[in-house]
Amino acid sequence: MDQIVIRGGQRLKGRIPISGAKNAALTLLPCALLTDEPLTLRNLPRLADVDGFGHLLNQLGCSTTIEGSRPEDFGRVMTARATTLTSTVAPYDIVRKMRASILVLGPLLARAGEATVSLPGGCAIGNRPIDLHLKALEAFGAEIELASGYVKAVAAGGRLAGGRFTFPVVSVGATENAVMAAVLAKGTCVLENAAREPEIVDLCNCLVAMGAHIEGIGTETLTIEGVDRLHGATYRVMADRIEAGSYACAAVITEGDVELVGAKASEMEATLAALREAGATVEETKGGIRVAMAGRAQPVTLSTAPYPGFATDMQAQFMAMATLGTGASLFTETIFENRYMHVPELARMGCDIQVKGRTAVVRGVDRLIGAPVMATDLRASMSLIIAGLAAEGTTEVNRVYHLDRGYERLEEKLQAVGADIERISAG
């Protein structure tokens, strides 16, 4: 099994290209199931989850071709075409590896009138049920059955009727599934208290490019007027705001100066506000965002919240950044339970972190010491990388397959801005 070895203490300085967003790509790929014409996605990141989703599309009868598959290529281009769906079943052996696989449920139901999808896997960061996905689809006319670890959904007459659904709590995945299901409904579908993440805006814009009728994009109320068919399109995947924020935290903890090329400030305002709270210089550039730090980070008080609040996917990285800060930082995790699994691993490096329920207090220490650590999930693994970049000595990060699910060519990007980091392959 691969590991990443970091010899810390190097100040990061230079330009880091930000890849296409993993969370957007995994939402845009299932759009190919909604039409029999080609959907071409540009700026697609080279990630294990993206490759896995492509395999799932193949299983359902969707052909895929990829340009830019050489190791040195950034921003791959995938063309997917589902001329005829050969299956409406997403099997356990694929879905168990990747939670985002549940996002084929809505498109299959919309296109074929039925779908059978295994209950999902993915990161082990607590209980993430799909009940809101199913309730939204039921509100649009679907009949849902759960049996033997699978969800079976059927649209009476082969097509959803339409309807109105109010999310009792904001859910990104459920909003995405419901929007994709609604675009081919017979009537109008209204989603209230919908998630507003930039990735959902990206999804809606792609669907509109394919001929969908969606009003209220970027707001909490989405009105989707169903159409008879969608056509193909060419669409560029948005930049990854979580990747950009992760490298920003790395710049701060190493007292560095980096430009995040391709990042958009308008899509990550809460992250940038938190960086400024920590004392970083943050400014927009012609090509992205510059983040620079002189001295140790100031204490921050952060509580995760649905967009436009502070993203739960940035919590672990900011916690790592705060470990060498000047005082005590307070973190409250409101989205997922059990999302502090990185804390024991950070403690191995000398971090002072106390967790009580959903709250964590991070007291800055004068130094971190490199140690062997183990990644537990995608964002937790990045927090270990960030801490390792600033630690004295050598840090060995194990189970890096978690990183490969969400960070494209991480070692190469960090090496280019001065980090002493390498991947050691097993065997």
UniProtKB/Swiss-Prot annotation:
Location of this chain's protein in the cell: Cytoplasm
Gene3D superfamilies per the UniProt record, alphabetical: Enolpyruvate transferase domain
Binding residues annotated for phosphoenolpyruvate, in chain numbering: 22-23
Keywords, in A-Z order: Cell cycle, Cell division, Cell shape, Cell wall biogenesis/degradation, Cytoplasm, Peptidoglycan synthesis, Pyruvate, Transferase
Cited Pfam families: EPSP_synthase
Pathway the protein acts in: Cell wall biogenesis; peptidoglycan biosynthesis
List of residues that carry 2-(S-cysteinyl)pyruvic acid O-phosphothioketal: 123
Coiled coil: none
Keyword field contains Signal: no
Binding-site list for UDP-N-acetyl-alpha-D-glucosamine: 99, 128-132, 313, 335
Top EC class for this record: transferase
EC identifiers of the protein: 2.5.1.7
Active-site residues, record numbering mapped to chain: 123
GO molecular function, a single term: UDP-N-acetylglucosamine 1-carboxyvinyltransferase activity
Catalytic activity, reaction form: phosphoenolpyruvate + UDP-N-acetyl-alpha-D-glucosamine = UDP-N-acetyl-3-O-(1-carboxyvinyl)-alpha-D-glucosamine + phosphate
InterPro entries: Enolpyruvate_Tfrase_dom, Enolpyruvate_Tfrase_sf, MurA_subfamily, RNA3'P_cycl/enolpyr_Trfase_a/b, UDP_GlcNAc_COvinyl_MurA
Domain of life assignment: Bacteria
Family in the record: Belongs to the EPSP synthase family. MurA subfamily.
Functional summary from the UniProt entry: Cell wall formation. Adds enolpyruvyl to UDP-N-acetylglucosamine.
HAMAP family assigned to the protein according to its UniProt record, in alphabetical order: MurA (MF_00111)
Record protein name field: UDP-N-acetylglucosamine 1-carboxyvinyltransferase
Annotated organism of origin: Sphingopyxis alaskensis (strain DSM 13593 / LMG 18877 / RB2256) (Sphingomonas alaskensis)
